[in-house]
Amino acid sequence: MENVLEPKEAFNLFRVPSKLENIVTALMVSIISNDKKRMNEAIESAEFFALELTANELELAKSYVVKILNHIRKINGLSPMRGTENA
């Protein structure tokens, strides 16, 4: 079974600003969820949260998602995603 990194644990580990927590959570759910309905709801939520953010904040949120995903891959014994050095 995969190791799971709880959202609060990830936010603390990577010091995600509270302003970005909602969109980072929604993006993570949209990527990780196996349930199509839940995935679509998460995408809609992410789009809603994105309306309140600047382009720089969106890029920052994306970089946190990549960092968290790579950390999850690492704790599950996988190598980091390629092409994400600048994220």
Specify the residue positions occupied by each region the protein language model found.
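Short intrinsically disordered terminal tails
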Residues: 1-7, 74-87
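N-terminal acidic leader/helix
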Residues: 2-37
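Intrinsic disorder/low-complexity segments in short proteins, especially the signal peptide
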Residues: 10, 25, 32, 56-58, ...
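Short, charge-rich amphipathic interface segments used for partner binding and complex assembly
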Residues: 37-77
